[in-house]
Amino acid sequence: MKFTNGFWQTRAGFTPLFAQEAYDIRTDGTSLEVIAPTRVIQGRGDVLNRPALTVTVSSPAEGVARVRIEHWRGTASRPGFELAEGDVGAAEVTESGGVLRTGDLEVRIRQGAPWSLEFWDTSTGTRLTGSGHKAQGYLTGPDGAAYLHEQLDLGVGELVYGLGERFGPFVKNGQTVDVWNADGGTSSEQAYKNVPFYLSSRGYGVLVNDPGLVSFEIGSEAVERVQFSVGGEALEYLVIQGPTKKDVLRRYTGLAGRPSVVPAWSYGLWLTTSFTTSYDEETVNSFIDGFAERELPLSAFHFDCFWMREFQWTDLEWDPRTFPDPEGILARLHERGLHTCVWINPYIAQASPLFAEGREKGYLLRTASGDVWQWDMWVAGMALIDFTNPEATSWFQEKLRVLVRQGVDSFKTDFGERIPSEGVVWADGTDPEAMHNWYTQLYNRAVHEVLEQELGEGRAVLFARSATVGGQSLPVHWGGDNTSSYVSMAETLRGGLSLALGGFGFWAHDIGGFEGTPDPGVFKRWLAFGLLSSHSRLHGSSSVRVPWAFDEEAVEVTRLFTRLKLSLMPYLFAAGAEAASTGVPIMRPMALEFEDDRSAAHLDTQYLLGHDLLVAPVFTEDGTVEFYLPRGTWTSWWTGERTVSTGEWRREVHGFDSLPLYVREG
């Protein structure tokens, strides 16, 4: 959100006040509390009739500093994310100011004017970032609404990454990003998985601890700063020291949660019914028979929306017209060595039998007038399960347990983004704006808990679309609704790499694209990319993604890359275990793995799969691909040719049966 009109002026209707000095600094030995008036105090009269900000600095974990800025403490503030809590800082106040030390991170607040709050890495003697003149602000808008913002310095050449799954440029400098979950597809500025956490090329990260709307201006309003703002009377953020990006991810996921281990079978190929196609048990069997006849390895089969009766989503009951024997079909799929997944969402259609039950028991979200909140987008008259009500959560979970006991192994937890933020009342009184992004965490956690309780630890896996901070602990997530084109394939990868820098260790996407029907070339190129992702799923909207629907070569490509992925299983499972223990993702942006290589900083069309496999998907019809081979010794997976690179760009042409795939020595 922009508040200024150039450096000197403010946008019409906004009144800004900034922290001008650290007037009074106090400590209890573990934290600092600062009174930061919005004018320089030169006489006793200056302390009157003017707002002052209260700034508290503490440390919840080693190497992490928490800064809380408050105007009026008496105003109810939104709760933050569920973060690990501690109090490990060592603070002192001297004549020159206040200092808080936590591990190798040091926070320095200068006494007096001008306002200066700095973050230093003492292991390297490097100033990471800081807040200075006109940086820490309290503003009122034209409608009287209050906002708080902070601006942290950007150094020369400093790059910013992350902020969740974003499909635009991988490097976020110059962008405006509103952290607000939305069902916008992969070709817009909106995102399904918004995470108010960014990672800097200078070896630190910043988390804004607010589940509501957080607006970022990354060198886009004040070009030498990252600005983040929230509505209300309080703003809290955490600065996380590295010194490497991987160290930052370890510390961040130590606070916000690390991915759980997913079952080995989930790394294999998933096939689905697709969305609006017509299917029944005979159709499902024909697909699976087709894979078996062609010797195509398959790990899981997914039933999309129409396993339930139309107009009744979500009733969690099999449609007896198409699946009269659900226990039987699930058992028969298991006998064939397949695991099973079904589609769900947290919306209850008016025609669903669950609607009347949920309304009667108070399990559905209410409006301020006490009515059940409803609308007609998606399914007619749909309501929303209120997961802030523990009884509603248990009610929903019991319905899911029935399905797991029938033989369902996984759930595709679709949607979770279209959550109203005005005119509704949650059972626990949570601010509706805060619940908009946070809802997905409650939804996915409720489902994940059922799978873990019923199947055992390490055997739960979701296929989730929406997320926020903490969502990384409930894998797997997929990239949402893309289209069947090379351009969409590339934007899908950008979203996945961006998400990876928020500690999301596992990720998938719809091979061939969701909307439309890919031409055979796009499908075959996407197969190679999809089967060299952590998780792999064949899924579409109005057309199926069985490879023989395209051409015989697609069958060969499916066989080749599925077998390749299966051969990598020990390697992938080890990378998954690393993600679960450290927060370092399986699919790694080049900037994460090659920090000192400036040529790697912007790369978003290639990645490392685990620590040692470089993958460069092909995004062209003729098979031409340009990619960067970092310094080191690399061996071509296909030819065994060994290359000693000094850091070089390569141009290759690949058929559908290959792509640049290089193994790092060691």
Q: Where do the language-model regions lie?
A:
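Carbohydrate-binding surfaces of carbohydrate-active enzymes
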Residues: V34-A36, Q42-A52, T56-S59, E295, ...
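Aromatic- and carboxylate-enriched substrate-binding clefts and catalytic-loop regions
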Residues: E70-W72, E82, R110, P297-T558, ...
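Short, glycine-/Ser/Thr-/acidic-enriched flexible segments
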Residues: W72, P114, R202-Y204, P211-L213, ...
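Active-site-proximal structural scaffolding
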Residues: R50, Q190-A191, L199, F228-V230, ...
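Generic recognition of flexible, low-complexity loop/linker segments
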Residues: G43-R44, T54-V55, D183-T186, K193-V195, ...
